[in-house]
């Protein structure tokens, strides 16, 4: 009601309804704001937050595992490459010596037995990638003896 109105006129219902409309509208606006900031969606937010945390945790775990594997793989490569290269040089010397004797059958047999997958097979190495036999690789030692016997003839 306005200050000029004494309430005896027909505008009273309009004023009251206008005030009621404004009050109702304020309540609706308040409810709309409450809906936005209210607790109705907390469960959904908690679930999505938990999903995001789980996803990031899983990705972090995978990244850590991958990094550790790459690191240990690199360390293993760094430690083992010189040993493998040394064995490769010895195999190359054996094959080079054998080919000079003009015995194709002997050369082919040596080439088959001294194949890289045979020479570096895990049965010849321990967990630390050291040769199992004390000093020599069995197959390489065999062919070194063959070459030495050929040279002594």
From Swiss-Prot:
GO biological process: protein maturation
Annotated stretches, region: deca-GX3 motif: 60-100
GO cellular component: cytoplasm; nucleus
Residues annotated as transmembrane: none
Superkingdom field: Eukaryota
Keyword Cytoplasm: yes
A Pfam cross-reference name: Yae1_N
Localization per record: Cytoplasm; Nucleus
Key words of the record: Cytoplasm, Nucleus
Statement: the UniProt record of this protein carries the keyword NAD: no
Primary location recorded for the protein, binned into one broad class: cytoplasm
Entry's family note: Belongs to the YAE1 family.
Self-association state and partner proteins as the record states: May form a complex with LTO1.
Function comment: The complex LTO1:YAE1 may function as a target specific adapter that probably recruits apo-RPLI1 to the cytosolic iron-sulfur protein assembly (CIA) complex machinery. May be required for biogenesis of the large ribosomal subunit and initiation of translation.
Protein's recorded name: Protein YAE1
Gene that this sequence comes from: YAE1
């Amino acid at each position: 009601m306005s200050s000029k109105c004494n309430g005896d006129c027909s505008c009273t219902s309009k004023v009251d309804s206008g005030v009621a409309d404004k009050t109702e509208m304020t309540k609706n606006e308040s409810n709309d704001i409450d809906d936005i900031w209210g607790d109705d969606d907390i469960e959904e937010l908690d679930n999505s937050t938990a999903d995001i945390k789980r996803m990031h945790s899983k990705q972090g775990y995978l990244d850590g595992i991958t990094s550790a594997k790459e690191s240990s793989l690199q360390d293993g490569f760094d430690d083992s490459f010189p040993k493998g290269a040394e064995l490769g040089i010895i195999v190359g010397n054996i094959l080079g010596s054998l080919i000079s004797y003009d015995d194709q059958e002997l050369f082919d047999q040596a080439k088959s037995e001294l194949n890289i997958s045979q020479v570096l097979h895990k049965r010849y190495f321990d967990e630390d990638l050291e040769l199992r036999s004390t000093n020599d690789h069995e197959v390489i030692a065999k062919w070194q003896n063959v070459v030495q016997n050929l040279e002594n003839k």
